[in-house]
Amino acid sequence: MKVGITYHEKFSQYDLGPGHPFRGDRFINVLRLFEDQGLLSLPNVTVLSPQAVSRQHLLKVHDGEYVDLIFRLAETSRPYDVETPVSPQILEAALLIIGGAVEAGKAIYEGRVGRAVALGCGYHHAGRNYGGGFCLFND
């Protein structure tokens, strides 16, 4: 059975700073570990390259006013709250990470892989009209 792993080099932009557990290098470190263990050279493992989700895609889950707020905050690198920073880089990474979840599901649905791992996913503290717990959006 073929296994897909979603990854994009810009995932590492979801970095909340030195000493924080949400560091951007965690994505590179996981990929490096996979490489060191020979997982990425296995014939049944493929890296899936996600595309950033659109605003329209976000609106399937999130309120439009909330989505607009996050995009405005990103323009000026202002935080959403004390634990949820926003910047153009973090927003770009978030849209790609969510795109990774979409790509993983799509690859399974289309039969390109039997299973998939969406690196970076698990941002579950955001609700329809709020963020929190380091999460801008719910993936």
Name what the model sees in each region.
Residues 1-139:
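HDAC/HDAC-like amidohydrolase catalytic core signature
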